[in-house]
UniProtKB/Swiss-Prot annotation:
InterPro entries: Dur/DurB-like (IPR046016). There is a cross-link at residues 4-14 (Lanthionine (Ser-Cys)). One of its GO terms (biological process) is killing of cells of another organism. Belongs to the type B lantibiotic family. This is Lantibiotic ancovenin. Maturation of lantibiotics involves the enzymatic conversion of Thr, and Ser into dehydrated AA and the formation of thioether bonds with cysteine or the formation of dialkylamine bonds with lysine. This is followed by membrane translocation and cleavage of the modified precursor. The lineage of its organism: Bacteria, Bacillati, Actinomycetota, Actinomycetes, Kitasatosporales. It comes from Streptomyces sp. (strain A647P-2). Keywords: Antibiotic, Antimicrobial, Bacteriocin, Lantibiotic, Thioether bond.
């Protein structure tokens, strides 16, 4: 999979994982 990280105001998702 491609490692893509998206940072949001509340939650962030990286490589299809959300924390």
């Amino acid at each position: 999979c491609v490692q893509s990280c998206s940072f949001g105001p509340l939650t962030w998702s990286c490589d299809g994982n959300t924390k």
